[in-house]
Amino acid sequence: MQIPLSDIWRQFRGEQDELYAAILFQIRIPRTFAAILLGGALALSGYLLQTFFHNPIAGPFVLGISSGAKLFVAVVMIVFLRYSRTLSSVDLIVAAFAGSMLSMFCVLLMSPRVQNMSFLVLIGVMIGYICSAVTDFLVTFAEDSDIVNLHNWSMGSFSGITWENVKTIVFVVAVTGILTFFLSKPMEAYQLGETYAKNMGVNIKMFRVLLVILSSILSAVVTAFAGPVSFVGIAVPQMVKRLFRTAKPIIMIPACFLGGAVSVSYTHLRAHETLA
């Protein structure tokens, strides 16, 4: 249902129509806020992974992190719905984080045996396909009601977002984003090489662990509430880097978040206009 701009302005001036007010304040605005926050989180997650692997095609979807999160959320949804239990925002985030960490752990487990980082990305792609295959298998044998919920969620949509979800998203993204910003100086040193970073006093092992955890949390919160969303984590950091002509993390971190927020929210609004 399309709402004219004049009617939207009237809602904010206090001349409220009950139907328009319900649609605007309970459906449209929460989804738009979620698109902004989750888009920024996804782009930031991609930037962290590209920094970690020194590879421009690394991202949460390519490395199988989103697929691992999708698998665990699918399992939790099937189990909870089968026993008529209500899924909370925390349940979704914990399940998605566990899945994303497991996928990332599998990739890192192979890293000591692999010399080429590009091959490590291919391992992530393989893990992603395995997780997707297992998810499809579970959906095939799930009950009809479970399939409907899983299908709607797995398409990558903001349609189920509520104000309670937005509160959780704001908290998780804000905390993770602030922690990421504090890593800007170690990230800049790490971009110049591990030897240089060590000489600058960076604890490489701890730094890598923090990158993995932060990128997994950001990817998990996106997958938990919007389903698996691809390409944003890969494309936006590269677009931002070329736009600002810099690779400095202190600029790239907020710029990637802003770029992801703009691209996803714009896509969400355009898709809604097309399908409305």
Segment roles from a protein language model:
Residues 1-276:
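Alpha-helical transmembrane segments in inner-membrane proteins
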